[in-house]
Amino acid sequence: MSSLVSRCQVIALLVLFFFGVCLAGKDIPANFVFGDSLVEVGNNNYLATLAKANNFPNGIDFGSPTGRFTNGRTIVDIIYQALGSDELTPPYLAPTTRGPLILNGANYAPGGSGPLNSPGSTNLDSWSPEQLKAMMFGVNYLAPVFFKKMDGQTIAISSLSTLSRAANLYRQILAKEVAKAIAQDTTTDLPKASHGVSSSSVKEELRPKETYFCDFYGRPIVYPILTSARRVTWARKINYDINNM
């Protein structure tokens, strides 16, 4: 509670300061920004990180990506221009942000900011097989149980329902596209029976080996290592199993 009060006091002081500057008819002499992806303007473009906003639809209102994790201006850009500035605060790491230009302000915020020089680094190697299985098979069970235990979270439950529908639609579309792509090369990959080889032995070649996974509750899920002749059938089976978990 005390930390919340302190934050409100800081925000109130900043609002009063900027309001006083505007009433006095003075321009803000400089604007220095610290934060994360909410206010970043392109510092990550100059860092060795995967967290970059240098592709569409980011920056679509500018006509091209600017390094902002948004379609247009950040909240700091909007406030700064509303206070009378004609320019946007440049990223500190940009090669052009040098010399006297820094005296007018600079943006030091990187997306995914943290104590390291490379923000947003991946940590897939640190995940255990159990965590990966939970993400693959257990989310559909775990999420409703989690939200049902939270009293009064109707908004969260509504959002969960929307996400569930979107996830189901994505799985259906993905399964159709996979089945369509696999069906195109099925006829070319089928082994042909030669003289002296019975059709039963060819079918034996097509029999896939099995590999075992467990869902979030430890129940075995058996999926074969697919050969071309069975890919379409098992693509449909995987989609059916996931939708009915």
Curated annotation (Swiss-Prot):
Name the protein family.
Answer: Belongs to the 'GDSL' lipolytic enzyme family.
**Quick one: a GO cellular component term?**
extracellular region
The molecular function terms of the Gene Ontology recorded here are: hydrolase activity
The answer, when asked if Cytoplasm is one of the entry's keywords, is no
Which enzyme class, named as a word? Answer: hydrolase
Q: One GO BP annotation here?
A: lipid catabolic process
**Keywords on record:** Hydrolase, Lipid degradation, Lipid metabolism, Secreted, Signal
Q: What name does the UniProt record give this protein?
A: GDSL esterase/lipase At4g16220
Active-site residues (renumbered): 37 (nucleophile)
Q: Where is the signal peptide?
A: 1-24
User: Where in or outside the cell?
Assistant: Secreted
